[in-house]
Regions:
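Hydrophobic alpha-helical segments
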Residues: 1-279
Length: 279
């Protein structure tokens, strides 16, 4: 039923955090402040990524049509309506970080091995320097991220279209700013990146790339890809590529939730969202 169904204050806060991550890709100030009264930095990061991880897994299970084992059928309540609140029309962007990046001169040896394994002495991105406050979490998360960015079966152009679209939908300006650069390296033009923000119906897409943008939209809105869009992608893509489409969108929705909720601030030389109106 949700956080207002007679829970104690703490349990209701945890449920509300899950709702806010799902609806808004963002933890409200009220929820964040309540969590900070009991949780340390690493636990706060774990709250965000636990909720985000299972949203990601739900998107994958729904899109692939994974059927529950027979013994699990009775676990999902069938007599409770699934109430989904409307997301904010304009996602919020925090003007200051909730968790600050670790300054370079405060890096421990462990953090230095994570963020600067080659000993360059240069600072890492603000997101990485923030997540490094939880080294135990950082290591496996970096492996997942590296797969999407460098090991995926998808062409770089396709990967960046999907990442930019989900970043735009989630209001994750930091994610957009980083991947505008990556998109240009993969051959995306400024006009095409503006078209990504406008969506699948924007003039100029070829049918297949429009289907990719639509897949990101459907995953964001419904946690699944419609059969029509799936069939359109499957006409060209292998099973591995179809999996990577969902993994890319779901993985970067997770990143968006963290960026927004932690208040990761843009580096000074990064581009902001294009000014094209509402999502």
């Amino acid at each position: 039923v949700g956080p207002d169904a007679g829970w104690g204050r703490w349990d209701a806060t945890i449920l509300r955090a899950a709702d806010e991550l799902y609806h808004d890709s963002f933890l409200s100030d009220a929820t964040w402040m309540t969590l900070t009264k009991r949780y340390d930095t690493q636990q706060l990061i774990d709250v965000i990524f636990t909720g985000a991880e299972y949203i990601m897994l739900s998107m994958m299970a729904n899109s692939f049509g994974v059927q529950p084992d027979a013994r699990w059928a009775a676990r999902l309540p069938t007599d409770v309506p699934r109430r989904i609140g409307a997301a904010r029309a304009t996602p919020l962007r925090l003007e200051r970080a909730r968790l600050e990046p670790i300054p370079v001169d405060e890096w421990s040896d462990e953090v230095r091995r994570l963020l600067d394994p080659n000993g360059t002495g240069r600072p890492a991105l603000n997101l990485y320097m923030t997540l490094a406050r939880h080294p135990t979490f950082y290591r496996p998360r970096a492996v997942q991220s590296a797969y999407i960015r460098t090991g995926s079966t998808l062409a770089g152009r396709v990967r960046e279209i999907l990442i930019l679209r989900i970043g735009w939908l989630c209001g994750a300006e930091y994610e957009w700013a980083q991947h505008v650069r990556a998109g240009r390296r993969e051959g995306l033009t400024d006009e095409e990146m503006q078209r990504i923000a406008l969506g699948a119906r924007a003039p100029g897409w070829d049918p297949f790339e429009a289907a990719l943008v639509r897949a990101a939209d459907e995953l964001h809105r419904d946690d699944t890809i419609t059969l029509a869009t799936w069939d359109e992608l499957a006409a060209r893509y292998s099973e591995q590529e179809l999996i990577d489409v969902v993994v890319t969108v779901a993985g970067y929705r997770m990143v968006s939730m963290a960026l927004n909720s932690l208040g990761a601030q843009l580096e000074p030389d990064r581009e902001r969202f294009p000014n094209i109106g509402s999502r």
